[in-house]
């Protein structure tokens, strides 16, 4: 009799698990209720999701610390579970967060919103799309569409939140547009491709040698000697009128070029690849553009610096097989207790 009771208990427990799994899959609900669960690879996409979904969804980001580099992040079992439990995933795409793409590939029922695909990014193109002023607006539109399809009774709520968020986003595009007259046609040296979308949107230019330098820095390589010599001459002659310095990646060549720029009074704008702790995406972008405005208005620029842990570039595979990225501090033991970069 006891064996039968034990067998019955096991079968009943297993049945309850199956029923629970089935109800979660069919309803699209998370374990904590009927709210849609949204997971993002990095924090600035979580910000979009929270702004639009409000209290109608649970939103979480796998990476929320400045000190973590998304290129070669290694997700934990808990990260995999969080993705598996989600209904919607927002990723950067373009190979930037390939580990997240792999996690979402294992979840058949998850709806994916891929920023790179929304922009029509091709393989091998610059994956730092959050500096493209269009991307957040496109993600907001797509998320609103997906949420409205899943939860049609709150469609007006999502659309109103989207409109409010896009109104805030317009502060960035308004700022960019206000700078175009003074920025247009100026030659800029970007130490790495991070800021290139912003450079394009401002109407600035980069020489062929600078483009090769930025790519070499990103891949952890040295530029060709002749290219380096040409860049040095472009700085001395002030053909290059601005240095855009990614503070999270450096090498000896970059340090020397920045020193040369300072000697020749070519101003420096410091930018970051990842969203600084304690700032929203919009605050982060506006802060950098405001500093650029000061330079364009005749300011001397900033003192160049590099954060603790900034090393000699990083190698990128722009496909979807992951990245090796040495320009940041990588301690993934605890996402919330990461050692922070100094900003």
Feature map (PLM): residue ranges:
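Extracytoplasmic metal-acquisition and chelation regions
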Residues: 3-10, 17-343
